[in-house]
Regions:
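Catalytic-core segments of thiol-dependent peptidases
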Residues: 106-205, 217-218, 223, 240-241
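Residues in well-ordered beta-strands of folded domains
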Residues: 68, 168, 391-393
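Short extracytoplasmic/periplasmic juxtamembrane "stem" segments immediately C-terminal to an N-terminal membrane anchor
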Residues: 16-27
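Hydrophobic single-pass membrane-insertion segments
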Residues: 2-13
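Loop/turn elements at helix/coil->beta-strand transitions in domains of secreted/extracellular proteins
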Residues: 63-66, 97-102, 160-166, 206-212, ...
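N-terminal extension/subdomain marker
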Residues: 44-161
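Residue-level signal for short, function-critical loop segments
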Residues: 73-74, 108, 171-173, 396-398
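Terminal, contiguous helix-loop blocks that mediate binding/assembly
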Residues: 23, 30-60, 175-176, 180-215, ...
Length: 679
């Protein structure tokens, strides 16, 4: 049994095995706890209920509950001890055990960081007298199989009946296309179809719905995921964005006595989640990251799907008339999720923000969808601009996946007209001749006007280029001295990427480069790095002075970590000073579909490498500018306690160049010619 109170700490790398006194007392001698139950009446069906489904009236008093957690340990447990931390939170939650059964199914990890759970078996744990106790165990099964989940649900319903049931999925999440729950022992996960199959074979359905179903996992707050559970649950709680490694705050269990229905439970979960992270970010500013969590009413999902279908059926009808250009621009501008914690693009955007952007072209249909979403989203909170509580898959970065996505969504009977639309939209994006308007882009002449440190950059687009323009950014490169390079060609380091580019009605691109870059400084001798760091401004539907830069973390003596860990380190510029935030461990090749929800704690590493990738500049077969990565990275090593970052002016005489980078409405990228700064 895990004993003792556990309070979450800011450090993501805490050694859980050393943080608590853990004992194994064996199986429970208690019989299954059966709280008193009460009958619940149903409301009469309405015309909106196409399946003649009835909705239960709200409870007038607090019901008895059985809360079920399906905890797939994965590397989150074997590497970080994250499941153990949450089990300890459950023990310390103070939940009223007389009214609430809490049962946990564990497995799917190669190693567990406590003595209660063993990797060779799967366990069902029951919370008794503030301790988790084994009530059932068997030889380890694959938690990525639907049957394993179904068996757990059957066991709980049969042995721990209650007025209401809540089900929480704990582990990795990767959105509707990839699914949930990586069992690292079997290399398997649960797809949306498998989750649907598991619930279909379980005791929970139209006659006995779960009061609430939630995902303590990344990226599962999509309309497609919610659709899977519409027949099996009343309310749904999940995050649109990547969840931090600490996940939910299970102290919310103590508040269940004050909740009569699932919407109230969902609100408590969201509030505890945000209270915890607000406190964490105050104590540890470097831990700050984007967080979202929402509770939605699955009963209102049918109206959302209907409005979604009407909007995108009309858009689909217009794609052949050139509407693809404007729709593509709206898609690009939509708030996106899961952009920086994995090399995978999930193509998930905020549905409310997307609908808002489409209002100019389709005012009636977009407004109807927004109205439906208002009824659907019961409660949501975030520290993210344009996050409205529900995301949707919309192809853009990876249009080739749309065909497979369509098969998945069609099998789930989700929004067939929308599925037809995303197929047609993707086909338009992949048209082979779509980038022809920019074949002469490298001949466009860039202009520079320097005032002090600042450089005003501009470039005129042709009428044809303007027609298919979607977005623009600019890069700043530094030419390497010949004696510094590894090749015979000129090499350039990418030191800055800016997203704040404007386009006039006449087709003129303009941007202002402040003429400053971030340099690393050695604290012990005051020496600055020879080159600036590579800074990439973040754009995910919002534009702030927030950047990331690639780095490597070295652990010189800890065998539990790789010798070399690649990461993206986030940074904010405030009052002219760089402020380091969190760093994301870039997902490994074997688990690349799943974002790594655990942030890198830089304090765990003794040596940092800040590198700049080197490129050569040439032309492609059409005469357009082409950048080629040389395979080399130039940079500098700094000890953990012997560096700082400073924003400093660059010397234009050292050979700095600008280039505009255009993305057209079909997803093609085009580079302008290089033009020298300071001349």
């Amino acid at each position: 049994v895990l004993v003792g109170v556990f309070d979450k700490e800011p450090s993501d790398s805490e050694d859980v095995s050393a943080s608590a006194d853990k004992k194994l007392t064996g199986e429970s001698n208690k019989k299954p706890q059966v709280p008193d139950t009460e009958d619940k009446k149903t409301a009469p069906a309405t015309e909106a209920d196409e399946d003649n489904e009835t909705r239960e009236k709200p409870n007038t008093k607090v019901p008895s509950r059985t809360v079920m957690l399906y905890v797939v340990g994965s590397d989150l447990e074997s590497r970080y001890g994250a499941a153990t931390m949450d089990l300890m939170e459950i023990e310390a939650s103070g939940v009223n055990e007389k009214k609430t059964n809490v049962l946990v199914y564990t497995g799917g990890a190669k190693e567990w960081q406590n003595t209660l759970v063993d990797e060779d078996e799967n366990y069902i744990l029951l919370l008794e007298d503030e301790e988790l106790t084994v009530v059932e165990s068997h030889k380890a099964k694959n938690m990525g199989k639907a049957a394993t989940l179904t068996e757990f649900l059957e066991y709980c319903e049969e042995n721990y009946p209650a007025d209401e049931y809540e089900l929480i999925f704990w582990n990795h999440g990767a959105g509707p296309l990839y699914g949930y729950g990586l069992d690292e022992k079997n290399g398997d996960l649960l797809s949306l179809q498998e989750l649907s199959d598991a619930l279909e074979d379980s005791p929970f359905g139209k006659s006995k719905k779960l009061e609430l179903l939630g995902f303590d996992a990344c990226l599962m707050g999509s309309i497609e995921t919610a659709w899977v559970f519409r027949d099996y649950a009343e309310y749904f709680v999940a995050s649109q964005e990547i969840e931090p490694g600490q996940g939910w705050d299970y102290a919310f269990l103590s508040e269940l006595d004050g909740c009569k229905n699932g919407d109230e439970v969902g609100k408590v979960i969201v509030e505890y989640y945000f209270d915890f992270y607000e406190d964490l970010f105050k104590k540890s500013p470097r831990a700050e990251t984007e967080i979202t969590l929402s509770c939605v009413d699955l009963y209102a999902l049918g109206d959302v799907e209907k409005a979604l279908e009407e909007l995108f059926e009309n858009i689909d009808d217009d794609l052949g008339d050139g509407t693809i250009k404007e729709i593509s621009r709206c898609r690009y501008k939509s708030k996106a999720f899961g952009k920086f914690a994995s090399s995978t693009s999930y193509d998930l955007v905020d549905l409310k923000h997307l609908a808002t952007l489409l209002e100019d072209e389709y005012p009636d249909e977009a407004e109807a969808l927004l109205d439906a979403l208002e009824e659907y989203v019961v409660y949501e909170d975030s520290n993210v601009k344009n996050a409205g509580g529900v995301s949707i898959y919309h192809p853009y970065d990876t249009p080739t996946l749309a065909k497979d996505a369509s098969k998945l969504l069609n099998a789930l009977s989700f929004a067939p007209k929308y599925v037809t639309y995303i197929n047609n939209f993707s086909k338009e994006l992949r048209k082979s001749g779509s980038g022809s308007n920019y074949r002469s882009f490298s001949k466009n002449t860039g202009e520079v006007s320097v005032s002090g440190d600042k450089s005003d950059l501009s470039m005129q687009l042709t009428k044809e280029q303007l027609e298919t323009f979607s977005s623009a950014k600019y890069y700043i490169f530094k030419e390497l001295p010949a004696e510094e390079t590894f090749s015979k060609q000129k090499e350039y380091l990418n030191i800055f990427s800016g997203q704040d580019v404007t386009l006039s009605a006449s087709g003129e691109l303009s941007a202002t480069y402040q003429g400053k870059a971030v340099f690393a400084k050695k604290t012990s001798d005051g020496e600055y790095s020879e080159f600036p760091l590579s800074m990439y401004q973040i754009y995910d539907g919002t534009l702030e002075e927030k950047y990331y830069f690639p780095c490597m973390f070295y652990d010189l003596d800890n065998g539990d970590f790789p010798d070399l860990l690649p990461a993206n380190w986030l940074m904010r510029i405030r009052d002219g000073k760089p402020q380091l935030l969190n760093a994301y461990d870039m997902a490994s090749d074997e688990n690349k579909e799943f974002p790594n929800k655990y942030l890198v704690n830089a304090e765990d590493y003794e040596l940092y490498f800040f590198g700049n990738n080197s490129y050569t500049v040439g032309t492609d077969d059409n005469g357009n500018t082409q950048l080629t990565f040389t395979g080399s990275s130039y940079g500098f090593e700094y000890e953990r306690d012997d560096f700082s970052l400073e924003l400093r002016p660059i010397d234009y005489d050292d050979g700095y160049y600008a280039v505009f980078v255009i993305e057209d409405v079909y997803g093609n990228t085009h580079f302008s010619s290089f033009f020298r700064l300071g001349e």
